[in-house]
């Protein structure tokens, strides 16, 4: 569990500890907003993401896996009776409980990819990737805001092929005047799209087809996860899925 992942700094142990830490923070957000606010201030003053892995480094692999799985079970139990539209605090603006839990799914999938890459494992994608893809599409404004860039006007049509072979689409596929396809679009497999928006693969190492300047710029900075701008992956760093 101490083997290094290909992304900077963290081991597989650190990945699991990070997921455990923020599953617990999500539980606080859903059940005790005041405690969440206190903890958020502590986390910001003590290293942020790096503080999230410190406890895990002091545990054995078995202990860490146990507390992570127990914590995830507690989170699922707390979420079962929630109004999906209820607002809950997070780091930055509040969000709906549904969005909070979808973000946890996205984070687990993304860090799970780091673990798979470190171990040389291949995961089989499922249609649950739609949740990750949806966050990636809706996070387009955030991808600009986190870099203090102004998002250009205009929509980008996203058309993805699901793992089961279905079609997933976001935003108007026309160019707005009824004369043809959207000027800016991203098409390809849902897996490739999710790998790019979570910054687990460089765009050049996928089969996504990116058309138009708005789409090209977005895909160069796409970021589905919260926090400062991610470092992403270098071209050629990964070629497998």
Regions found by a protein language model. Name each.
Residues 2-22, 52-64, 89-107, 128-132:
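Alpha-helical scaffold segments that form or flank carboxylate-/histidine-based iron centers
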Residues 19, 23, 72, 190:
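Short amphipathic alpha-helical/adjacent loop interface patches that line ligand
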Residues 24-81, 128:
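Short, helix-capping/interhelical loops that line the mouth of catalytic, cofactor-
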Residues 16, 65, 69, 76, ...:
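Non-transmembrane alpha-helical segments in soluble domains
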Residues 23-24, 201:
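Residue-level detector of secondary-structure transition/capping positions
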Residues 31-42, 81-241:
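Structured surface interface patches that mediate subunit assembly and partner/cofactor docking
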Residues 10, 18, 26, 66-70, ...:
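Broad hydrophobic/π-residue packing in well-ordered secondary structure
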């Amino acid at each position: 569990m101490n083997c290094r992942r290909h992304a900077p700094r963290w081991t597989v142990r650190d990945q699991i500890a990070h997921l455990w830490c923020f599953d617990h923070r999500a539980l606080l957000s859903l059940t005790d907003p005041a405690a969440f606010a206190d903890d958020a201030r502590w986390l910001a003053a003590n290293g942020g993401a790096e503080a999230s892995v410190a406890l895990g480094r002091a545990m054995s692999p078995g202990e860490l896996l146990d507390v992570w799985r127990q914590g995830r079970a507690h989170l699922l139990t707390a979420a079962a009776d929630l109004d999906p539209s209820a607002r809950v605090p997070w780091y930055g603006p509040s969000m709906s409980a549904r969005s909070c839990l979808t973000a946890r799914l996205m984070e687990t999938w993304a860090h799970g990819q780091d673990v798979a890459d470190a171990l040389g494992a291949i995961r089989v994608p499922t249609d649950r990737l739609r949740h990750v893809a949806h966050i990636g599409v809706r996070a387009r404004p955030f991808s600009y805001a986190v870099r203090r860039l102004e998002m250009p006007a205009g929509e980008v049509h996203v058309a993805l092929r699901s793992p089961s072979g279905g079609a997933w689409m976001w935003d108007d596929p026309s160019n707005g005047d009824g004369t043809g396809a959207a000027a800016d679009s991203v098409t390809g497999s849902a897996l490739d799209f999710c790998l790019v928006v979570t910054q687990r693969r460089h765009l050049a190492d996928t089969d996504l087809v990116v058309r138009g300047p708005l789409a090209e710029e977005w895909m160069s900075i796409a970021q589905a996860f919260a926090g400062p701008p991610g470092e992403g992956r270098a071209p050629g760093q990964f070629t497998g899925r």
